[in-house]
Curated annotation (Swiss-Prot):
<dbReference type="Pfam" id="PF02492">
    <property type="entry name" value="cobW"/>
</dbReference>
<dbReference type="InterPro" id="IPR003495">
    <property type="entry name" value="CobW/HypB/UreG_nucleotide-bd"/>
</dbReference>
<dbReference type="InterPro" id="IPR004400">
    <property type="entry name" value="UreG"/>
</dbReference>
<comment type="function">
    <text>Facilitates the functional incorporation of the urease nickel metallocenter. This process requires GTP hydrolysis, probably effectuated by UreG.</text>
</comment>
<comment type="similarity">
    <text>Belongs to the SIMIBI class G3E GTPase family. UreG subfamily.</text>
</comment>
<dbReference type="GO" id="GO:0003924">
    <property type="term" value="F:GTPase activity"/>
</dbReference>
<feature type="binding site">
    <location>
        <begin position="14"/>
        <end position="21"/>
    </location>
    <ligand>
        <name>GTP</name>
    </ligand>
</feature>
<dbReference type="InterPro" id="IPR027417">
    <property type="entry name" value="P-loop_NTPase"/>
</dbReference>
<dbReference type="GO" id="GO:0005525">
    <property type="term" value="F:GTP binding"/>
</dbReference>
<comment type="subunit">
    <text>Homodimer. UreD, UreF and UreG form a complex that acts as a GTP-hydrolysis-dependent molecular chaperone, activating the urease apoprotein by helping to assemble the nickel containing metallocenter of UreC. The UreE protein probably delivers the nickel.</text>
</comment>
<keyword id="KW-0547">Nucleotide-binding</keyword>
<dbReference type="GO" id="GO:0043419">
    <property type="term" value="P:urea catabolic process"/>
</dbReference>
<dbReference type="GO" id="GO:0005737">
    <property type="term" value="C:cytoplasm"/>
</dbReference>
<dbReference type="GO" id="GO:0016151">
    <property type="term" value="F:nickel cation binding"/>
</dbReference>
<protein>
    <recommendedName>
        <fullName>Urease accessory protein UreG</fullName>
    </recommendedName>
</protein>
<keyword id="KW-0996">Nickel insertion</keyword>
<keyword id="KW-0342">GTP-binding</keyword>
């Protein structure tokens, strides 16, 4: 990874209901003791995702910020990311020691991506309930995200989705880029996601610079 912002900014995208908020919660709870973290959520008209994270005690309330994007959630992370860049700047000013900010996009479709000025590493979350064809449908989230997460693998038998076919299609669409199968309710696969963020985002280097500065 060439571009390194301080703190590391990880964009989390994916369709409504795929598990973006559940991922933010799981990452926060497993990483908060080791890294200084904050989360910014994007919702169309409410701050519902931020409220979910608050109720789950994912992070202290002052480290959670909800951005209301209005009618076009993808615009707020892509064409005009200023509302999110402003939120990042405020969080960084409030917590200068931050190592990591997770930015959860509003419910979007397969075509939305994060602006490179907003996100250093992008994770795209889809779920098995969408059907095994989702990886092969492609779209920038599936083909270009640094990491693809295929969530809710426990539902595969109920929706007739074959995980081997999904894995094969994900490899075909993504080439060398990695993907992970997860069940965010049980925590299965979360360690692989954390490992990816730490290594690809050079998080331990960021942390040692911060804490020895």
């Amino acid at each position: 990874m060439n571009k390194q912002s301080n703190p590391l900014r990880v964009g989390i995208g994916g369709p409504v209901g795929s598990g973006k908020t559940a991922l933010c919660e799981a990452l926060s709870k497993r990483m908060r003791d080791r890294y200084e973290m904050a989360v910014i959520t994007n919702d169309i008209y409410t701050r519902e995702d931020m409220e979910i994270l608050l109720r789950a005690d994912a992070l202290p309330p002052e480290r959670l910020m909800g951005v209301e994007t209005g009618g076009c959630p993808h615009t707020a992370i892509r064409e005009d990311a200023s509302i999110n860049l402003e939120a990042v700047a405020r969080m960084t000013a409030d917590f200068p020691e931050l190592d990591l900010i997770l930015i959860e996009s509003g419910g979007d479709n397969l075509a939305s991506t994060f602006s490179p000025e907003l996100s250093d590493l992008t994770i795209y979350v889809i779920d098995v309930a969408g059907g095994e064809k989702v990886p092969r449908k492609g779209g920038p989230g599936i083909t270009r995200a640094a990491l693809l997460i295929i969530n809710k693998i426990d539902l595969a038998p109920y929706v007739g989705a074959n995980l081997e076919i999904m894995a094969r299609d994900a490899r075909k669409m993504r080439g060398e880029r990695p993907f992970v199968f997860t069940n965010l309710h049980t925590g299965e696969g979360v360690d692989q996601v954390i490992d990816f963020i730490v290594k690809q985002g050079l998080l331990d280097e960021v942390r040692s610079q911060h804490h020895h500065a």
